[in-house]
Design a protein with these regions (language model features):
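Conserved glycine-rich cofactor-binding loop
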Residues: 13-14
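SDR active-site lid
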Residues: 172-268
């Protein structure tokens, strides 16, 4: 990657965004950091600079389209032309629908869906005239398969998927060299489960299996540099959720009705008075990880296979070819066997003539 690559990451202060910042910083990118929390943004800035990169801190709410557009303009002025824009910022409410308010649904939608729209429009403003650039969306298995207790977030991710599909189709129609892709994530060990608003009786947790945010960061880095693929799936659980729902949606409804509540909670009563980030950021630098390190996986073999598809297919082809060659060698008669066969054939012919 060339040193001048300019990357914008929303939700950069913590979780997946923070892990993605670290991944791009490791490769020498100049990174514009967008989020609301100033503590986390400053922590991310220090990490970028420690890795030898350049960081531009832009504290703002992605639900504000004017602020996002102004931020993109500033990135172009101070860092240079935007090469990659990653839409990651999100918020959620853990709650049964019957306990939520319309205002809570609106807020989750504004950040988790319209925040992606605002980021995309700001990026396109600069990318389309020069006919280059890449926009990457952080998707989710929940963009295909909704679960109980996260209706607002699931609906926002479904909306994001619909928006993305329209965007990609229009870019293809226009024969644009601006690329876009989406990366669907599994359950991740991020701080969101300790700061998103919750109305659950017990503490919220990601539905196992849980993956570390670095898995997501590596996937987003790869997708940003290989954006021609329509979708990427991270984790076997993501693949199962998406395709299982396509095959048997009614079964999935009943299964999640039985299992989906306990799977999203763990021991310990939730504090109803703890601060949440629905409207304001939670103070402090929370980094990339949540509290589930002891239960989290640091690798996704499914994504590795998907992102190295040519290597996998080549390996399969070589294995099949080698097996066929060995089979041919093992079943092919030796020189001695061929000579003996000719002798037997000649002898049989002589016997028939004599007879």
């Amino acid at each position: 990657m060339r040193k001048s690559e300019v990357v914008v990451i929303t939700g950069a202060s913590a979780g997946v965004g923070r892990a993605t910042v670290r991944e791009f910083a490791r490769h020498g990118a100049s990174i514009a950091l967008i989020a609301r929390g100033s503590d986390g943004l400053e922590g991310a800035r220090r990490e970028v600079e420690a890795a030898g990169g350049k960081a531009l801190v832009l504290p703002l709410d992605v639900a504000d389209p004017a602020a996002v557009e102004a931020a993109a303009d500033r990135v172009e002025r101070e860092l240079g032309p935007i090469d990659i824009w990653i839409n990651d910022a999100m918020t959620s409410v853990f709650s049964p629908i019957k306990k939520m308010t319309g205002e809570e649904f609106r807020r989750v939608t504004e950040v988790t869906y319209l925040g992606f729209v605002n980021g995309t429009l700001a990026a396109l403003k600069h990318m389309l005239p020069r006919d280059r650039g890449t926009i990457v969306h952080v998707g989710s298995a929940l963009a295909y398969r909704s679960i109980p207790l996260q209706a607002a977030y699931c609906a926002a991710k479904h909306a994001t998927m619909g928006f993305y599909a329209s965007l990609r189709t229009e870019l293809l129609h226009d024969k644009s060299h601006v690329r876009t892709t989406i990366v669907h994530m599994p359950a991740l060990n991020t701080p969101q489960f300790g700061w998103c608003r919750s109305k659950l009786p017990r503490k919220a947790q990601p539905v196992p299996p849980i993956f570390q945010p670095e898995v997501a960061g590596r996937a987003l880095y790869h997708a940003a540099h290989h954006p021609n693929r329509r979708e990427y799936y991270v984790g076997g659980s993501t693949v199962k959720a998406i395709f299982g729902n396509k095959l048997a949606p009614s079964f999935a409804d009943h299964y999640l009705a039985r299992m989906g509540y306990d799977a999203q909670q763990y021991d310990g009563h939730e504090d109803p008075n703890r601060p949440d980030n629905l409207y304001e950021p939670v103070a402090g630098d929370h980094g990339a990880h949540g509290v589930f390190d002891d239960r989290s996986r640091d690798h996704s073999w499914e994504f590795w296979g998907e992102s190295h598809l040519k290597t996998v297919l080549t390996g399969v082809g070589v294995t099949i070819g080698a097996g066929a060659w060995l089979w041919h060698r093992c079943t092919r008669p030796t020189a001695a066997e061929r000579a003996a066969s000719k002798v037997r054939s000649f002898r049989n012919q002589v016997v028939r003539k004599v007879a």
